[in-house]
């Protein structure tokens, strides 16, 4: 069952029940007036209208949580389907939810699809068993096919740059390839190695823990305040561990912690499992699943590494500010980590037993939603100064 509530009208509510078909996944449409649910066993996708209570069915979706992509303007949606052992893409108009066209794609086992930012092309890629990235026009013409290598695990993550000039392709070979939108050939290959020796202008931030030292000489306390401080120092409260977490800038060369995946288990934790572009399209963040505690930030203007963040725990989630070149990440600890071109910082969440396992920005980049296993909280972040923005855009 899926339930929806109105923020402005608390008395309004909606319940969606597919009955025996079940619901494996649900998502909003861009206009927030429709909910798309995928039934169990990928039997159908149902589009539910919250205005007219009408519904439209799309048969045989390829995936439950993947294989659906909306255009940037929200007018069209592409849905990957499969029938008769063949992959297809259905194009629907979101105003009527009518099928505008359907075309077959040259994939063995389609993994996902995504519209380009300018809504002119659709990127389709195959399962990890077949390295294949296909670029289609909305009318079904195959414009380009890219294959970096054969006979090995292939594509793992794909992401368009905000301007649509580059298509980032992360693979199981621990390499990110940036394809140009004119030639559809790689303009850069970013290799993730465990021994990093440069470039010289890149910065490595390493998370460290250290005792919190309070310089009493720098404080001015009256007699009552001093007595209270002494009594507080004798407390057995667990909050007074006096341990702080911060980033330390370390020099090259740097050895990145590396984990070798077991060869006898499926879905190996290797390759580029996280790939995202900054709002201005200048920076690209990547995470190599072989190195789960490291987050790589690449400068597209210079085609080189800009920063490397080394955490004490596995990086759970990382997300760019939707407005500024600012990155937030979490590791399942009680800390929030942030990076900008000016530097990086660690912030402690002032809530007891709160472990940040996931996060999400709001649309204007002024606040973050932090998720724990059983709770959530909102944090407000300051806007970047004009000086920081100009510095980040100063090529």
Language-model features: locations:
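WD40-repeat beta-propeller superdomains and closely related acidic/aromatic-rich repeat-like regions
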Residues: 1-395
